[in-house]
Amino acid sequence: MTDSPSSLPMGPFDRVLIAGLTGSGKTTLARRLAGAWDLTHVELDSLYHGPDWVPRETFLDDVAKFASTERWVTEWQYTSKGAGGILEPRAQLAVWLDYPWRVARRRLIRRTVSRSVTRAELWNGNREGSLLRLFDRDPEKNILAWQRKTRNNWRERMPAALERNPHLTLVRLKSPAQTDAWVEGLRGRSPTSPR
């Protein structure tokens, strides 16, 4: 595990998991990597949340279906729901957005307010709730409370995840600038480029 963008693994990789605190930019990075390496991006939130935010019964079957394909990138989440046990053995690269709390917090506030104001559809007809929900202390009802509750999850969980999955290459990115520099270095590295 190295920190300098020039010394980080450059790939390309065929199956990628992106870990990080809620709001850190996992989905945004997944889209960027999908474009850089010609991978299929499957957003786990779209598989998990059915209409009216009800969890879909077919979630794990859907995860297993796309995980069995050869080329994908997705967010490393829903591990407590069983997705980790399906995705981790197949993945080749784990990218960990280990950003400072204030960076992820600012990004999540901006994203939540924007989604709430625009009422943009997220997944399966669902939309961000009222901004008044941000005053609720229940992490199941307030994404900011959820972020606070889970803020140390990856720092606690990553060592065990890597021990369970010694085949994974890890790229740990500690700032958006470091992420941008790493992604910029991927330009021109197609799926057929030498690794």
What are these regions (language model features)?
Residues 2-11, 141, 145-195:
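NTP-dependent small-molecule kinase module
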Residues 18:
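Hydrophobic anchor at the beta1->P-loop junction of P-loop NTPases
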Residues 22:
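The conserved Walker
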Residues 26:
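Conserved lysine of the Walker
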Residues 29:
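Hydrophobic positions on the alpha1 helix immediately C-terminal to the Walker A/P-loop
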Residues 32:
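Active-site signature of alpha/beta-hydrolase-fold catalytic machinery across serine-
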Residues 40-99:
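Conserved nucleotide-sensing/catalytic segment adjacent to the nucleotide-binding pocket
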Residues 99-153, 192-194:
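A glycine- and Lys/Arg-enriched "phosphate-lid" helix/loop adjacent to the NTP-binding pocket
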